[in-house]
Swiss-Prot record:
Name of the protein: Succinate dehydrogenase [ubiquinone] cytochrome b small subunit B, mitochondrial
Keywords: Electron transport, Heme, Iron, Membrane, Metal-binding, Mitochondrion, Mitochondrion inner membrane, Transit peptide, Transmembrane, Transmembrane helix, Transport, Tricarboxylic acid cycle
Protein origin, superkingdom: Eukaryota
Binding residue positions for heme b: 95
Protein purpose: Membrane-anchoring subunit of succinate dehydrogenase (SDH) that is involved in complex II of the mitochondrial electron transport chain and is responsible for transferring electrons from succinate to ubiquinone (coenzyme Q). SDH also oxidizes malate to the non-canonical enol form of oxaloacetate, enol-oxaloacetate. Enol-oxaloacetate, which is a potent inhibitor of the succinate dehydrogenase activity, is further isomerized into keto-oxaloacetate.
Organism (species): Xenopus laevis
Family named by the database record: Belongs to the CybS family.
Mitochondrial intermembrane face residues: 79-83, 136-152
Subunit structure: Component of complex II composed of four subunits: the flavoprotein (FP) SDHA, iron-sulfur protein (IP) SDHB, and a cytochrome b560 composed of SDHC and SDHD.
Membrane topology designation: Multi-pass membrane protein
Subcellular location: Mitochondrion inner membrane
A Pfam family: CybS
Principal localisation: mitochondrion
Gene3D superfamilies: Fumarate reductase/succinate dehydrogenase, transmembrane subunit
Length: 152
């Protein structure tokens, strides 16, 4: 809704005569609101909240781990060993934990269900890491096991 007003009725008499033409103005724009409208600023930058830095760092860490896995998997094939086995165990467990954490965030609703799902996720991740470390220590290790599977 707009009303047709003369700008000169909103301005003082000492303003330039160029403002005497007819313009379409919104109804709430009265003389006392004109100063506020002229001086209001629009900020297009996003608001920075206290937790946004932590979320950004978490996202960066997830992406860094994903990129590191792209190099770690071929390196594990070329240079198998205990250090590579334990690095794979930690990286794969953390990558899986973060991925399943996003599934829990997206698809589990309700306060109690979320707490149970997160507790289960931490337990699953801890058991996965412990199992991979046990396999690395007491058996052939991840790298050699994958090589043995490929040789079948």
């Amino acid at each position: 809704m707009a009303t047709l007003l003369r700008v000169s009725s909103l301005c003082r008499a000492n303003r330039a005569s160029a403002f005497k033409s007819l313009l379409i103005r919104p109804l709430p724009c009265l003389s006392q609101d004109l100063h506020m409208v002229q001086t209001s600023q629009i900020h297009t930058s996003p608001n920075h909240h206290a937790g946004s830095k932590a979320a950004s760092m978490h996202w960066t860490g997830e992406r860094a781990l994903s990129v590191a896995l792209l190099g770690l998997l071929p390196a594990a094939y070329l240079y198998p060993g205990a250090a590579m086995d334990y690095s794979l165990a930690a990286a794969l467990t953390l990558h899986g934990h973060w991925g399943l954490g996003q599934v829990v965030t997206d698809y589990v609703h309700g306060e109690t269900k979320i707490k149970m799902a997160n507790t289960s996720l931490f337990a699953l991740s801890a058991l996965t890491f412990a199992g991979l470390c046990y396999f690395n220590y007491h058996d052939v290790g991840i790298c050699k096991a994958v090589a043995m599977l490929w040789s079948l």
